[in-house]
Each structure stands twice: as C-alpha cells, then as structure tokens.
C-alpha cells in the first residue's frame, strides 16, 4: 500500500536479452549465474529451472571450453529463460554459442584479446542479432591499465570500459550494456558513477565476489542500494558464494526495499521484545517459507504488540497487531471484526494472504483486459 518509488531512473538506450527489455525505463532485470559444470547438462538445466521458479529474468552460464559450448547447445534447447554466455580468453567460443542461440554475450576486455578478435565477436553478434555485455572487472583489468594505475581505481575501470565502448561505437554496434564490477563497495560504486556520466547505454550492476550469503548480501545491498537510489542501473546480479537461488531472492528484496520493483510479499515485522503477544519470529519464518510461491506484490505487517502494530497495519495490505490470546487483523488498512487466535496464527494468516493474492490477481487481470480492449 506504500506509494511508488521516488527514484528517478537514469535515461538509457533500450536493448533486448531474449525477450527481456533492458534500459529505457524497462523494469530492472534480476540476473543470476549457474555454478554447475556446464558440461553437466542435466545439473545445469535443473539449476536454471530452480532459478526460474524464484523469478529470475536472465541467467548467465560460463562457457570455458568448446566442450562446454557443445553442452550449451543442449542447455539452451531445454531453457525458456534468456541465457547469457560468459566468455573469457577464447573469442571463438562466442562465435560458436552464437550459432546455438545464445541471447547475450558477456566478454571480458581484460582477457578476450586484441581488437581484431573483438571485431569478429561484434560481427557475429550483429549477424545473429545478439547484444553484448562489456564486463569490466577490477580483478582482471588489461595489463597496460594495471601498470598505469598500479591498482584498480574508478578511473582505471572507467578507462577499460570506455576503451571498449569506443571500439563498439566505431563498429557502429549499439546493442550492448556495460558493467564495471569490483569486490570493494566504494570502488564499484564510484566506477559506476563515473561511467553513468559518460555513456547512455544500459548498465549491469554488481558487487563482484561479494562473499557468502550474509556478508555478500550486506555488501550488495549497500553498493547496489546506493546506485539504484541514484537512478543508476538496468540489470543486476547479487554475486554470492551460495546457492544461486539466494542471489535472486536478495536481488528482488533490494528492489522491493527501494520500491523499484515489487514481487511477492514484503514482510514488515518487529524484532520482538517482552511485549510481544505471539511468536512473531516463528510466524514470519514460517510464512516466508510457505508463501515463497506467491508473486503478487503486497505488504504484510506482523507486529507483536499495540505500540507500532496499528500504525503499520494502516499502510499494509494485510496486518496483524498482537494482543492477549487473540490478535487484531487488518485488511487494506482497515481493522476487521475478525481476530486471530494467537496459537493458530500461521495457518490463519496464510489463508488470508492467499485469498487476498487471488483477489488482487483477478483485479489486475480485469485491468489488463480493459487496457487491451481500449487499444
């Protein structure tokens, strides 16, 4: 029930990764990357499908060898989500996966080779109508740039990016996005800020090698949160040493927190104290697991007492305010006569949330149909 985001997004050009629009006001796409052996086709396809179930928009797949490229052909045939091929060192792999229907090529200027090789990749991308991501990384800058700056700096990452943007510009190829990732939050943020002032192409955001599930999520939330709040960013990936499914969940949580893109339940829950009248933590944990399948955006407040409960419930789709034995229930900010038994809270809340999601989905379908009729 909160209003939309106050963030004014940076203007950028539009490209498509598969059928997913990127830039020019399109919803910020959430990306992840498989961490299976690409030559293990079954395992890779299974992971891609798991990512699809939690809402991933785009999946990147590492293609380190020609054997992996052959495996990619089979993976692509079994996938419905757009796939990006991650290419390092051997530009010929990019040419091969283009034949097999890849939706985007990610090349690393630090190791892809000289300009003649880039020209071949661009020519191939043009022939197959495939966009490119110029993926700069603070850990793999070109040797001459490393020597010039001594260490990764925002200016170094910018120079690497602009060098290759200029190449694509000279080749009259504009179907590309750019990233300037680093594992240090300040280095990444300042690199993206510099780049955003130089080009109007879409930007892919990420704090690379951010760490494990907890620390990596925190770093990514800080770094990407800063950039997104400034309107910078068109796609993102949360790079975690964890199950890639967690990357997608964290990515959507960041977008949801900034009210940029809503998907699923936004839980508002108190940290609890001795005033709580029911098990808030257990209730929230159980509902997060039970309601993972819901994609309908809604705010659900679960507050253990009457200090902040009524106020949060007023701006929530569904709200619960703790009281002795039976807690107050709110819908669309209005207190209902019905009360929840504190001992049966989880089942009752789940039923109410699912019922509300069905109503909201039905209303959305009506609106969409009316818009289609008016076209």
Curated annotation (Swiss-Prot):
<comment type="pathway">
    <text>Isoprenoid biosynthesis; isopentenyl diphosphate biosynthesis via DXP pathway; isopentenyl diphosphate from 1-deoxy-D-xylulose 5-phosphate: step 5/6.</text>
</comment>
<dbReference type="InterPro" id="IPR016425">
    <property type="entry name" value="IspG_bac"/>
</dbReference>
<dbReference type="GO" id="GO:0016114">
    <property type="term" value="P:terpenoid biosynthetic process"/>
</dbReference>
<protein>
    <recommendedName>
        <fullName>4-hydroxy-3-methylbut-2-en-1-yl diphosphate synthase (flavodoxin)</fullName>
        <ecNumber>1.17.7.3</ecNumber>
    </recommendedName>
</protein>
<keyword id="KW-0411">Iron-sulfur</keyword>
<keyword id="KW-0414">Isoprene biosynthesis</keyword>
<dbReference type="InterPro" id="IPR011005">
    <property type="entry name" value="Dihydropteroate_synth-like_sf"/>
</dbReference>
<keyword id="KW-0408">Iron</keyword>
<keyword id="KW-0479">Metal-binding</keyword>
<dbReference type="GO" id="GO:0019288">
    <property type="term" value="P:isopentenyl diphosphate biosynthetic process, methylerythritol 4-phosphate pathway"/>
</dbReference>
<dbReference type="InterPro" id="IPR004588">
    <property type="entry name" value="IspG_bac-typ"/>
</dbReference>
<feature type="binding site">
    <location>
        <position position="312"/>
    </location>
    <ligand>
        <name>[4Fe-4S] cluster</name>
    </ligand>
</feature>
<feature type="binding site">
    <location>
        <position position="273"/>
    </location>
    <ligand>
        <name>[4Fe-4S] cluster</name>
    </ligand>
</feature>
<dbReference type="GO" id="GO:0005506">
    <property type="term" value="F:iron ion binding"/>
</dbReference>
<comment type="function">
    <text>Converts 2C-methyl-D-erythritol 2,4-cyclodiphosphate (ME-2,4cPP) into 1-hydroxy-2-methyl-2-(E)-butenyl 4-diphosphate.</text>
</comment>
<dbReference type="GO" id="GO:0141197">
    <property type="term" value="F:4-hydroxy-3-methylbut-2-enyl-diphosphate synthase activity (flavodoxin)"/>
</dbReference>
<feature type="binding site">
    <location>
        <position position="270"/>
    </location>
    <ligand>
        <name>[4Fe-4S] cluster</name>
    </ligand>
</feature>
<dbReference type="GO" id="GO:0046429">
    <property type="term" value="F:4-hydroxy-3-methylbut-2-en-1-yl diphosphate synthase activity (ferredoxin)"/>
</dbReference>
<dbReference type="InterPro" id="IPR036849">
    <property type="entry name" value="Enolase-like_C_sf"/>
</dbReference>
<dbReference type="Pfam" id="PF04551">
    <property type="entry name" value="GcpE"/>
</dbReference>
<dbReference type="GO" id="GO:0051539">
    <property type="term" value="F:4 iron, 4 sulfur cluster binding"/>
</dbReference>
<keyword id="KW-0560">Oxidoreductase</keyword>
<keyword id="KW-0004">4Fe-4S</keyword>
<comment type="similarity">
    <text>Belongs to the IspG family.</text>
</comment>
<dbReference type="InterPro" id="IPR045854">
    <property type="entry name" value="NO2/SO3_Rdtase_4Fe4S_sf"/>
</dbReference>
<feature type="binding site">
    <location>
        <position position="305"/>
    </location>
    <ligand>
        <name>[4Fe-4S] cluster</name>
    </ligand>
</feature>
